């Protein structure tokens, strides 16, 4: 696992935290400011080889992370903290991370009522876990 401190000279464009962090991560690596997209994991990646997540992010529909990752186009997985530090993980590290900090919730009935795997809130324990492995 490696880390990257993200750029501080970046003006937020999105209210949605996931879109903002995806855009910030790309800007930090390339200097490009591009609109965040909404590509399904089996069709493409958030950026280059990366799948980018933060606290409370949805990982996949249902509980089967292995099935989801079998079709995910990403080869590296990024968790970005509230302090805008990116932890870049291999698939094996990401599986361990989601097993430790993922939860299964149910979508509202209005939106189909299906189960989904999500990351929980960012906690001290989560940050310590990442720091110990970086």
Enumerate the language-model features and the residues they cover:
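Nucleic-acid endonuclease domains
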Residues: 1-134
């Amino acid at each position: 696992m490696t880390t990257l401190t993200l750029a501080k000279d970046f003006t937020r464009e999105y209210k949605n935290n996931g879109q903002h962090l995806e855009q910030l991560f790309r800007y930090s690596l390339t200097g490009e400011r591009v609109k965040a997209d909404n590509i399904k994991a089996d069709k493409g990646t958030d950026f280059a080889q990366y799948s980018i997540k933060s606290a409370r992010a949805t990982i996949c529909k249902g509980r089967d992370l292995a099935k989801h990752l079998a079709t995910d186009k990403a080869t590296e997985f990024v968790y970005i903290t509230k302090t805008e530090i990116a932890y870049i993980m291999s698939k094996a590290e990401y599986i361990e991370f989601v097993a430790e900090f993922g939860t299964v919730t149910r979508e509202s009935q209005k939106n189909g009522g299906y189960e989904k795997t999500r990351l929980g809130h960012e906690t001290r324990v989560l940050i310590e876990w990442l720091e110990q492995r970086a």
